[in-house]
Amino acid sequence: MATDKKEEEKPVKRVKTPETLRGMKDILPDEQIYWEYFRRKAREISAAYSFGRIDMPILEDEKLFVRTVGKQTDIVEKEMYNFIDKGESKVALRPEATASVARAYINHGMLNLPQPVKLWYMGPMFRYDRPQSGRYRQFHQYGLEVIGGPDSVVDAQLILIAVRLFEDLGLKVKVEINSIGTATTRQEYKIELIAYARKHRKELCEDCTRRLSRNPLRLLDCKQ
């Protein structure tokens, strides 16, 4: 008995080719030479200034970033990759590294070491941000942290290291130094900022309207 050809023909299902998630990027072999060059320069300058390397977990307790970065910041409110794991713990992919370094300093009793403790790190961070040219949701960060040292001296040294690193990479940079002032002057500035913002309340975006009463200095961080 002949079978109708149309009945034999079945639609072919096309399998969608897997792609990287939005805001993520593969680093291909021909790019690795640049990454390795930067890593080598970063290692060399960190060692030259007596910084020790530290590697922290990519995954941390969500509360670590809520407490240290700030509950009302864009990072915590909008940009963290966070979820509840199979053990019902609230965890987050690290959006930055300073909080993790501070946690490690406490967890491993580094307070008992000769101060200041100088640490450097390098690795991927994650923020659910709007991807743009050269800006990804997984990005790589090199950083230095000094805990237990005089602030002004540490600030000067970190600025010097940053300039030297750029110079070692063959980049010409112009350094502009800003200051958030002292605790006293910052409070005075905050009062003036609130007064100005209230006069222009109708021009504020939704985020800034909320920040005005909760954390006025964050008005300066408006992305609109």
Please place each PLM-identified region on the residue numbering.
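Extended, charged alpha-beta segments that form solvent-exposed binding/catalytic grooves
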Residues: A2-Q224
